[in-house]
């Protein structure tokens, strides 16, 4: 028995050794540059998802959504009710939204929402104001989380944010109502000889949810963050999020159907935890899509170029102070994201380290809205002081002559330093190591005194 166990353990050890050797051989194989780039992008994306705590943010958004969904739908359907053309559309719109967004327990959720909205319609002006504040709280939380993903230090001004929120609360329901009304109308129109084949119609209808989701997610990623997001990046992120959302809907519905744990434990209240879990999954998918959108640009900035090297720390510091100096003359500050856009060759880590070093030495500081400002009088702050606080070697003058005006002036000073350095260090090692006549005489005198 013991022999068999030892033999089995030996075989497992051999198997692990072979697997480890096979993995080493695979890693040693030359890979296509695209494969390595894709792997690096995936690692960067996972790192950002962990750093931004997307799972935690999704949980927070799920709870806020649970509180705000009734106020949002109440305000939205109140807007639709103000237009006679949408009469009779609100019920179909609510049912369609619940069926579309909640893959399980949709009937129970729809019943609860209808009851809650009916009661909300009977509230006084104070109650309606409270519902509006709750809805605005959700929109503000969404904007804050997305701004954190894009490293936005300075949010929109209060008035501008209120206008954006109010536009979403009023125009969003109108667009949804127009969509549902148009779909219902097109379903009753006889297209005659131009009617496409039924198979094609079925395929288009099956594809419609994916396309609509991708458009909505793309608009969220491009409009909500207080940052300039390339349209192509937002579209790619929207498509990824839409695909993940469809997979999540199918998987969640299958899980609830085959493992009715919530119904067994909670009974009639099972719809609430099911809905809460689904809200969490939905927000996690949305945040992952946002991370993909951000990573399409951020991955290029992750390491930077020459300015990310310690040898060029002085040049990077001068660039940072130059941008802050120009902004100060306009009476403004510069955010981290704006600096990164102006100095993409620096990369996020090196730029963050340089800013922290300058802040630690009280050369710069951050304002209440997150912008960086100069904290020292530039007329009394010398280049020598800046170099001493960086604790890195001087960069070469070559390569700076064609840069910004401050680069050319810095290159001139560096050339003078290099010339004097050459003169000071124009000494052979023999001359350096050989004692001088004075040192030799002092040594003989010391030996004579000892004797």
Curated annotation (Swiss-Prot):
To which species is this protein native?
Halorhodospira halophila (strain DSM 244 / SL1)
Q: Name one Pfam family in it.
A: Virul_fac_BrkB
Question: Where is it found, in Gene Ontology cellular component terms?
Answer: plasma membrane
Which UniProt keywords are given for this protein, alphabetically ordered?
Answer: Cell inner membrane, Cell membrane, Membrane, Transmembrane, Transmembrane helix
Principal localization reads membrane
What does UniProt give as the signal peptide span? none
Record keywords: Oxidoreductase included? no
- Which family, according to UniProt? Belongs to the UPF0761 family.
- Source taxonomy lineage? Bacteria, Pseudomonadati, Pseudomonadota, Gammaproteobacteria, Chromatiales
Protein name per the record: UPF0761 membrane protein Hhal_0704
**How the protein sits in the membrane?**
Multi-pass membrane protein
| Transmembrane spans | 66-86, 122-142, 162-182, 204-224, 228-248, 268-288
Location comes to: Cell inner membrane
